[in-house]
């Protein structure tokens, strides 16, 4: 049965755990244990906000460790959960970090990036609220350039109507806009730490904002281009930057979700001959401890507490085991969820059931060329069969195998679709076999192609 969007009865605490699972079912097949775990974690956040007194601060999230091979839905569950709640979401691979003092990024950059995401989210939301006013002010500025500030109200009204109707889109005007030319560098890379940068405060910008002024530049441009530049400018003036930053920090602290992938790669396996690597991995784990347990990280927007951020760690754990992580880190990830490897039935459901399934995506893409693309049930079964076979024989990459198989299967159709307007193409099991059987039977070739 296909998952469909449901309208729920209003709950003062947001979605219930069962409703959260139903929402995740719209996009993700199976993995009920993992869905249940994240649904409970999310609901507990809402419950905590309703607890009164000092006890509220003592209630911390129960962080989650997801165990499962690649392509089974670990990242997608976390990402969809964040979208469902409009929470700031940040995904990072644990292998990108090294302990402080070594080459690599320091773990505190997680919080800096999460807050940046929260600020952008809040800023976008604030701009939508002032969009109408910003548009009005932008039109007034363009009218000043078109007909002059001293023109009569009748003239301005007449030209305003033309702007709104798009009649003056290609008219060139000369107008003053904010000078966005960078002076010097806004940030610099920290030596010995690739990918890590430190923001530099621009005193000129700060003083300009404080005095209500900023550098402008007169440019010649079309009316439609001027609108695209001036509306964001006017939006910036209308929104309260300080309030946005406060709201963003609060959003990151109380609703932020951090997904740390490949955590098994920093586990100490105890293998001989890799002592230095073991020390480095253990160092990263020790650096992660205070972040997950709860600490304060300084960002360019101000200090951010990590006490109530939900951390979801994941890994395949093919070589290392969860018990190879530092005992202290294991204690910070109390909820363990094992995700199942995908079966043939799962693959069939993944192809058909989600609202954004691959079959629907490819049909929509080819449909833009006025070509009707349909898949017979026998073809879906054959594709799932081949996906499982290659995963078993080559390497198990889960549902991601379907992407490579479908790309190879539909390569010729995608290439020729623009010359097949008005046609209907039905993919059946014979078509799938003709296109893929040679590759599937030749495992050496399958390793490179699929």
Swiss-Prot record:
Biological role: ATPase subunit of a proteasome-like degradation complex; this subunit has chaperone activity. The binding of ATP and its subsequent hydrolysis by HslU are essential for unfolding of protein substrates subsequently hydrolyzed by HslV. HslU recognizes the N-terminal part of its protein substrates and unfolds these before they are guided to HslV for hydrolysis.
Subunit-structure text: A double ring-shaped homohexamer of HslV is capped on each side by a ring-shaped HslU homohexamer. The assembly of the HslU/HslV complex is dependent on binding of ATP.
Taxonomy of the source species: Bacteria, Pseudomonadati, Pseudomonadota, Alphaproteobacteria, Rickettsiales
CC annotations in GO: HslUV protease complex
InterPro entries: AAA+_ATPase, ATP-dep_Clp_protease_ClpX, ATPase_AAA_core, Clp_ATPase_C, HslU, MCM_dom, P-loop_NTPase
UniProt KW Nucleotide-binding keyword: yes
Pfam families per the UniProt record, alphabetical: AAA_2, MCM
Entry's localization field: Cytoplasm
Transmembrane domains' residue ranges: none
Xref: SUPFAM superfamilies: P-loop containing nucleoside triphosphate hydrolases
Name used for this protein in its record: ATP-dependent protease ATPase subunit HslU
GO molecular function: ATP binding; ATP hydrolysis activity; DNA binding; peptidase activity; proteasome-activating activity
Disulfide pattern: none
A biological process from GO: proteolysis involved in protein catabolic process
Residues at which ATP binds: 29, 71-76, 261, 328, 400
Stored SMART domains: AAA, ClpB_D2-small
Keywords from the UniProt entry: ATP-binding, Chaperone, Cytoplasm, Nucleotide-binding, Stress response
Family statement drawn from the similarity comment of this UniProt entry: Belongs to the ClpX chaperone family. HslU subfamily.
């Amino acid at each position: 049965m296909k998952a469909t969007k449901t309208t729920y009865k209003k709950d003062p605490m947001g979605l219930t755990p069962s409703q959260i699972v139903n929402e995740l079912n719209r996009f993700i097949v199976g993995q009920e244990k993992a869905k249940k775990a994240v649904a409970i974690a999310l609901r507990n956040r809402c419950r905590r906000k309703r607890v009164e007194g000092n006890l509220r601060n003592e209630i911390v999230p129960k962080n989650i460790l997801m165990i499962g091979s690649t392509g089974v839905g670990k990242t997608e569950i976390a990402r969809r959960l964040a979208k469902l709640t409009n929470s700031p979401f940040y995904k990072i691979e644990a292998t990108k970090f090294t302990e402080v003092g070594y080459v690599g990024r320091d773990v505190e950059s997680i919080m800096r990036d999460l807050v940046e995401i929260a600020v952008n989210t809040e800023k976008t939301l604030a701009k939508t609220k002032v969009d109408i006013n910003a548009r009005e002010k932008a039109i007034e500025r363009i009218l000043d350039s078109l007909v002059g500030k001293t023109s009569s109200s009748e003239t301005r009204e007449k030209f305003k109507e033309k702007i709104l109707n798009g009649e003056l889109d290609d008219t060139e005007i000369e107008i003053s806009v904010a000078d966005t030319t960078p002076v010097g560098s806004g940030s610099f890379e920290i030596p010995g730490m690739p990918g890590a940068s430190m923001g530099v405060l621009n005193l000129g910008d700060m003083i300009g904002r404080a005095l209500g002024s900023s550098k402008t530049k007169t440019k010649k441009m079309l009316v439609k281009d001027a609108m695209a530049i001036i509306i964001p400018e006017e939006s910036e003036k209308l929104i309260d930057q300080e309030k946005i930053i406060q709201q963003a920090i609060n959003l990151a602290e109380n609703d932020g979700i951090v997904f740390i992938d490949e955590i098994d790669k920093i586990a100490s396996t105890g293998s001989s001959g890799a002592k230095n690597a073991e020390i480095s991995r253990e160092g990263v784990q020790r650096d992660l401890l205070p972040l997950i347990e709860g600490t304060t990280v300084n960002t360019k927007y101000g200090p951010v507490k990590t006490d109530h951020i939900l951390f979801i760690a994941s890994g395949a754990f093919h070589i290392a085991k969860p018990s190879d992580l530092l005992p202290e880190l294991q204690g910070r990830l109390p909820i363990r969820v094992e995700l199942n490897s995908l079966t043939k039935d799962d693959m069939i459901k993944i192809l058909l059931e989600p609202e954004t399934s691959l079959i629907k995506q490819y049909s929509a893409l080819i449909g833009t060329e006025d070509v009707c693309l349909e898949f017979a049930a026998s073809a879906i079964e054959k594709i799932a069969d081949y996906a499982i076979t290659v995963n078993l024989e080559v390497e198990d990459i889960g549902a991601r195998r379907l992407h490579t198989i479908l790309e190879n299967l539909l390569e010729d159709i995608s290439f020729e679709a623009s010359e097949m307007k008005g046609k209907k193409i039905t993919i059946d099991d014979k078509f799938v076999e003709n296109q893929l059987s040679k590759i599937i039977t030749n495992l050496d070739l399958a390793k490179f192609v699929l």
